[in-house]
Amino acid sequence: MKLRNLTLAVSLVLAGTTALTTAAYAQAKEQFVPVLSYRTGPYAPNGAPWANGYVDYLKLVNARGGINGLKLTFEECETGYDTARSVECYERLKSKGASFVQPLSTGATFAITEKAPVDKVPVVTIGYGRSESADGSVFKWNFPIAGTYWVAADAILQAIGKKEGGLDKLKGKKLALIYHDSPFGKEPIPLLQERAKMLGFELQMLPVTAPGVEQKATWLQVRQAKPDYVVLWGWGVMNSTAIKEAQATGYAREKMYGVWWAGAEPDVKDVADGAKGYNAVAMQHGAEPQSKLVKDMLSMVHGKGLGTGPKDEVGQVLYMRGAMSAMLGVEGIRAAQERFGKGKIMSGEQIRWGLENLNLTQAKLDALGFAGVMRPISTSCNDHMGSAWARIHTWDGKTWKFTSDWLQADEQVIKPLVKSTAAKYAAEKKLTPRTPADCQS
C-alpha cells in the first residue's frame, strides 16, 4: 500500500495519470474521477489540449485543498475518439468508483447513456452529446450542462440574423451545413430544419466522411450552390481542411460559422491569415489568457512542475474547455457534499443529485477563477442544461477574439423540440417520466 501511494505521488509530480485499485481508492479516501481522452489518432491535436486542461483543473482543485478537504484522484484511458474503445474505458474505470463520466464523444455518449441508469454513473456532456437529454424528466443520468448542439446551432443563426439585420432577413437565403458524418455531426440537423421552416431559408446538407481530409467534392457543391452562409460542424483535421478548401474555392471565411469544436487554435493555426474572418460559436468561454483561472493554473500547477501539457497552451480555447468541463463536474461533487456531507466521498447517485441542483452564481464562478469567462448556470430536475447562452468569436489571423455580445438561444423553439424528442425516446425505451417525488431523490 505504501508503494502504491508512493507511485501515486510520483506520478502526480511527473504530471502522469493516476491509477488506484478499488481497495486503494477506498483506503485513500479520495474521490475518483475517470478521464476518457484521446491523445492518439486523427483527433489528437484537438483531444490532447482538452485533456490537458481537464487534468490540470483536477490538479488545481487538489492544490487549492480539495473539495472541502477531499482530494481527487484520476486515471486517463485512451479512446482514440472511438466509440467501442470509449465504452471499454468506461467499463474499466467505473469499477474504481467513478464519480461521473465525460465521454468527449457524441457517439460514446449515445452508447453510455444506455448503461448509466443501471450503473448509476452520471454522464456529463459539456456543450455536446444528445441535445434532448436536457430534459431531466426523461434523462435522469445525463447532464448536457452549459448548452447543447441545438443551443449552438440557434446561436449561430441568431448571429447570422444580426449580420443580416434581423432573423426575418434570412427568408430566401441559402445556408449549407457541412457536417461530420457521425452522430456528432447530425445533432444540429433537427434544429436547423425546424428553423428553416420557420424562417424560410434553404438548408443544404453536405456530409463529410470521417476524418474529413477529402472535401473537394463537397466544396465543388458549395461553389455550384453559392450558399449565403456555411455552417461547419466538424472536428479535428476536417476543420482546417474545410477552411483550406474555402480559401481555394474563394468562399469568404467571414460567411463561415463553425460549431465550437471547429473554433479552436488547432483548426486555424496552419491556415493563419487564410482563416482570417472565420467565425465559430463559443459556448460560454473562448481563449482566456488573462483570466484568474489561467493565472492560478500557471502559478499553482505549472509553476510547481505539475503541468500536464505545454505551458503555452494554458488559456487557449480547448484547454479552457477541458478546464471548464472538469470544473462543472467538480462542482457537482461539491453540491452533493452540501447535502450529503462535506469532505466525504460521494457516490454516483449523490453526485447525480448535485449535478441536478447546481447553482453556480456569478459570485461563485468568479471565486473559482471564471470571472468574465462564464455566465451563471442553474440546473433542476427538468433542466439538466442550466444555461442557453453563447457568443461568437472570430479568428483575426493570430488569435480568437469575441465579436458578438452574449446570445441566448430561443428556448421557445428549443424546448418543444427537446420535449418531443425526449418523449419519443421515452416511448421507444418504455420509460416513465420522473414524478415530483423522484425529483427530490
Where are the model-predicted features located?
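Extracellular/periplasmic Venus flytrap/periplasmic-binding protein
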Residues: 84-85, 132, 140-250, 288-295
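Signal peptide-proximal N-terminal region
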Residues: 52-74, 165-168, 197-200
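Extracellular/periplasmic periplasmic-binding protein-like sensory domains
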Residues: 246-326
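Segments of small-molecule ligand-sensing domains
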Residues: 306-319, 330-405, 409
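Beta-alpha junction/loop-to-helix N-cap segments that form part of ligand/metal-binding clefts
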Residues: 30-32, 45-52, 64-136, 145, ...
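Sec/Tat signal peptide C-region and signal peptidase I cleavage site
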Residues: 19-26
